[in-house]
Regions:
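Glycine-rich, highly charged phosphate/nucleotide-binding loops
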Residues: 63-74
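Hydrophobic beta-strand scaffold residues
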Residues: 31, 63-64, 107, 135
Length: 296
């Protein structure tokens, strides 16, 4: 009986957990080490909190290493052996060529887009933000250039008309785990990306969530809300916009936008207040609603 395929797994957020779980559940693979970002302070108490990947790995009894800088600390770390594969899923650090050369077979990455589309840090959000009808996951052989490696496998899905980043996250994290297992279970057949068709998505900031009813259509704002809530969030002045639609909804307020479009806000949160429905906002903040409708 052949030995299981050895894996060193790099990942940090919830998106990476299904891929790690799938590898752990399949006896053809052996996850020998998990590398994750250091524990981070979270919430008002700033309590140091482990990543979802670390939590899962510890539950499975897998050794976890959390270097501040993988590239700087890699050479000094003692590895029991070189793995067959280095699997990277939303790790959160750019890895050096030294790290990429470490596995015997290949370094592979699960990326949440149909490469070469949406290379970069925020493919989930941008698929929704740009109104894409289709998205998916790519397993790529990693190279130094970001998300530019040969494609080892792809799987696509159609996006729902009301898709959100949260719903797409769950779909693609599951799909990515399935595709990862299928890809690593068979001989690799790399296909070079068409760099001429590459598109890119930047790391999001709070500035990406600013909206203006006088310069944006209802569809554009609605996509922002579905893409950017909860992070980095969507704001008009000091008011967080939490949920919207482009069709009339119960308990909503209607706001006119450019090109004679209307946005229906169903949930929002004034600064320092709890989230509320559109109709509750209308009753409690009539003056602010007037400014919102007037574009002030």
């Amino acid at each position: 009986m052949s030995s299981p395929i050895s894996i060193v797994f790099c990942g940090t957020p919830e998106f990476a957990v299904p891929s790690l779980a799938a590898l752990c559940a399949d006896n053809r693979f052996s996850v020998d080490l998990v590398i994750s970002q250091p524990d981070k302070p979270v919430g008002r108490s700033q309590e140091l909190t482990p990543s979802p990947v670390k939590i899962f790995a510890k539950e499975q009894g897998i050794e976890v290493w959390q270097p501040e800088s993988l590239n700087k600390e890699f050479a000094a770390h003692h590895f029991a052996k070189r793995p067959d594969f280095l699997v990277v899923v939303a790790y959160g650090q750019i890895v050096s060529q030294q790290v990429l050369d470490f596995p015997i077979v290949a370094p592979v990455n699960v990326h949440a887009s149909l490469l070469p589309a949406l290379r970069g840090a925020s493919p989930l959000q941008h698929a929704v933000l740009l109104g894409h009808a289709q998205s998916g996951v790519t397993i790529q052989k990693m190279v130094r250039e970001l998300d530019a490696g040969p494609i080892l496998g792809q799987s696509s899905i159609e996006l729902d008309s009301r898709e959100t980043t949260a719903s797409l996250h769950d779909k693609l994290s599951t799909l990515g785990a399935q595709l990862l297992i299928d890809t690593l279970s068979h001989p690799l057949h790399p296909i070079d990306q068409d760099n001429g068709k590459a598109t890119f998505c930047h790391k999001l900031t709070r500035d990406d969530g600013v909206i203006n009813f006088q310069t944006m259509t209802a569809v554009e704002i609605d996509r922002k809300v579905r893409a950017l809530v909860p992070w980095p969030g969507v704001k008009w002045n000091d008011i967080k916009i939490l949920a919207t639609d482009v069709a009339p909804q119960a308990n909503s307020i209607a706001i006119s936008c450019v090109h004679d479009t209307q946005l229906f806000i169903t949930s929002l949160q004034p600064d320092g207040r709890k989230p509320m429905s559109g109709t509750d906002f209308e009753r409690g903040y009539p003056e602010m609603l007037g400014k919102m409708k007037g574009g002030l």
